[in-house]
């Protein structure tokens, strides 16, 4: 008897479910031990969207890749290629995690799943996977250090320098900043992340202190002409102070919920500050009429393909 594709999927799902029934949950209930990290349906309709737009839309770590393109069409091609890569993320991240949970159910921490799965690969494929991992790490470090050096050199050093520094001086300052940042990262990695069950969750929690304010700043700067310098500064301070307050005084409150609360609070503070200052259009406001938001026909078609592919994946995956 030859099983159909759907039947094979059901058989695999049933075997995995019987092996670890307690892990077969997509939407967690409030009594689940992991609810603090993945608070049920709010993961899909709550604060996760704030982290999403802040990272993919306004993080220099991402946007500098598009800004480095030689033309707008080339930048759009890069963004679209990244969208196609995101479609296969379940195969790259989720599927190996499910396999690790079945093959190694007694792992002490989730971070050990990846090296354990790597140990199952044959020599040739292991080397290829390791090379890809190193390339990804180097690429991420390059983008991160470039962001750090650019922000410090152009927005801090040059802005407050007593004299007019030359380009050579700025380049040297940027390089020194990158080296110092990497040294700090090396010596702080183990104390900050070494004892954690999941470094990824910690990083998301920590960056959640800043992302709501960053998102508010960029949104009002782009689409609200009445925003002022003081209003966005107050929004940034509200984001940091309120995040720290909730983190320490309500430690069991899910950080995704916290990001949503902080985002709307920061936006309200920004609005209130602008209202107190007179609620008039800022002379530095961006004129959106001068900006061309048009996209090419190929970009629109590929966008539709990505949306259909994601929708099809969710509709056809086996569910419990």
Residue map of PLM features:
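Membrane-interfacial loop-to-helix junctions in multi-pass transporters
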Residues: 36-41, 119-129, 208-213
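Hydrophobic alpha-helical segments and their helix-loop junctions in multi-pass secondary transporters
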Residues: 5-9, 13-29, 53, 98-103, ...
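Juxtamembrane interface elements at the cytosolic ends of transmembrane helices
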Residues: 46-74, 156, 272-286
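Single conserved hydrophobic/aromatic residue that forms the stacking wall/gate
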Residues: 1-8, 12, 314-320
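Helix-loop-helix junctions that connect adjacent transmembrane helices in secondary transporters/permeases
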Residues: 55, 61-205, 300, 311-315
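Terminal cytosolic tails of multi-pass membrane transporters
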Residues: 14-15, 253-315
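Membrane-helix interface "capping/anchor" motifs
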Residues: 222-233
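Central hydrophobic cores of alpha-helical transmembrane segments
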Residues: 231-242
